[in-house]
Amino acid sequence: MKTYRSLTQEEIQQLKERSCTAVDWDEIEVVENFKTDYIYHTRFSGKVRLGVFEDEFTLAGGMRKHSGLYHATLHNVTVGDNCCIENIKNYIANYIIGDYAFIENVDIILVDGRSKFGNGVEVAVLNETGGREVPIHDRLSAHQAYILALYRHRPELICRMKVIIDQYAEENASDTGTIGHHVTIVDAGYIKNVRIGDYCKIEGAGRLKNGSLNSNEQAPIHIGYGVVCDDFIISSGSNVEDGTMLTRCFISQACHLGHNYSASDSLFFINCQEENGEACAIFAGLLRVTDHKYTLLIAGIFY
């Protein structure tokens, strides 16, 4: 576990000379080997913790960029070692950022209040008017979702399952979000109440609100240009690209959604591929594929 210390007066003066400001310099803590060399035009407020900035990132085309903080505003943020945070239009608030994160040209990233990050959101699957809602969570399986949606003649079972899910969601709720190690977020818009796992790559997303991106090193998640997601959970190894719009959806592992696909109140399980069309209140089973334009699926189970 890292140990932190307060800034020295010399370090505070160096930061001021680089056009950095703070509401209270005493609220900023740094690791022992911290240096101010790569921090410019940055504003700090609340409790801020900073790691070291020693390594470089190699970008596409051979461009090299040194880790550091450039033209950013941080509020109640912990920054890991060797991160590059640059050109944040508004601010980053209430986040713990892992090592080697690369965040550039982003509008805003924040957690506002206590969030469950998509856990516990009820998805009105199979009946768009409600009655068979499935509360989604990080560990949702097709089997569990099937029972929750179709075994409504077993009300005690459904009630107990929902209690377990609610308990899990509450245990994972926090007023601080996490951005994992080796995460890339570039050219993105509005990111609010989103938990982002290791090695996730977000490029040009329009809006991500109230959700979890359960990425990891072995199966990273990619979120592409123009994507808009509200009240969602996306599992490891999935790709959501090209203007896809999701509202109250669960995306299981290794799914691919793209080409302006639109879905609401739907569940997509392992290895689904959805492109071009629309979905409302569907239960998409394993290995389901649709890539035709004007395909509209409503209120059904599709395998």
Q: Predicted segments — roles?
A:
Residues M1-Y303:
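Domain-scale signature associated with acetyltransferase and cell-envelope carbohydrate enzymes
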